[in-house]
């Protein structure tokens, strides 16, 4: 039974990324008056994650340029964005969602657009400082701060994020190594010719690429990562490590 004081919303969107933002815009174009609420776990208005591993990381664009719309857009279109207040429970049968602050919203229509979280490596030393998983603005900014004192970077994972980070680190002058479990970069998403082209490009930028190789341990000193051990017996010196090994839904 729904509580008498529960707010009712025609359209609820859980997730403030590209998909959630686009959905809110599309709904407002078709329904000019129905209440639209976007629930965001992060403290920011919806932003584009694509530049986080490229132009924003490299300092080519300002922080405000990653945001999809300015605050006035949401006010003008009466789209409510609830920041830093993630959904914690969903009752499909009763058609309501509970938020972290205890607020409950009843809904007519619900869109789940939460994306995923970076998959974590469960190996020795995973708790050391200097190991980064790129997902949000704060992750990129933490990497930027670490870059100020770094000379050597190890990227674990040769997918899109890993390749983009490796290219960026090389552009910034870091000695960069990519550790990839499979025989080729991006092997699950591109054809062999494209994979070979990307590998050649990175190598031309000075990136060392180790395929058929797995990270087995993060080695550290004074609580900070200093090297990555692999299943081939290598120990790769590192001032920072970036991990991009897929997402967990």
Predicted regions span which residues?
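A Rossmann-like FAD-binding core segment of flavoenzymes
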Residues: 33, 81-98, 105, 172-249
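Hydrophobic residues in beta-strands of the RecA-like P-loop NTPase core, especially within AAA+ ATPase
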Residues: 155-156, 179
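Alpha-helical scaffold segments in soluble metabolic enzymes
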Residues: 22, 26, 142, 168, ...
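Short, flexible helix/strand-to-coil boundary loops that buttress conserved ligand/catalytic motifs
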Residues: 49-50, 125, 147, 189-190, ...
């Amino acid at each position: 039974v729904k509580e008498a004081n529960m707010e009712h919303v025609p359209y609820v969107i859980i997730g403030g990324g590209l998909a959630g933002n686009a959905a809110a815009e599309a709904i407002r174009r078709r329904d000019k008056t129905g209440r639209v609420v976007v629930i965001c776990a992060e403290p920011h208005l919806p932003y584009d994650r694509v530049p986080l591993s490229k132009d924003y990381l490299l300092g080519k664009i300002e922080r405000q340029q990653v945001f999809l719309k300015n605050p006035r857009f949401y006010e003008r279109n009466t789209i409510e964005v609830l920041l830093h207040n993630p959904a914690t429970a969903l009752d499909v049968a009763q058609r309501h969602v509970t938020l972290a602050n205890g607020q409950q919203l009843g809904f007519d229509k619900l869109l789940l657009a939460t994306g995923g979280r970076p998959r974590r490596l469960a190996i020795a030393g995973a708790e050391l400082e200097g190991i980064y998983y790129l997902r949000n603005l704060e992750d990129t900014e933490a990497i930027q701060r670490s870059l100020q004192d770094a000379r050597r970077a190890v990227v674990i994972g040769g997918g899109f994020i890993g390749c983009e980070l490796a290219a960026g680190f090389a552009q910034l002058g870091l000695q960069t190594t990519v550790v990839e479990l499979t025989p080729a970069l991006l092997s699950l998403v591109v054809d062999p010719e494209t994979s070979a082209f990307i590998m050649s490009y990175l190598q031309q930028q000075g990136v060392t690429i180790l395929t058929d190789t797995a990270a087995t341990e993060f080695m550290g000193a004074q609580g900070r990562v200093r090297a990555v051990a692999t299943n081939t017996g290598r120990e790769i010196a590192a001032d920072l490590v970036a991990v991009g090994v897929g997402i967990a839904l």
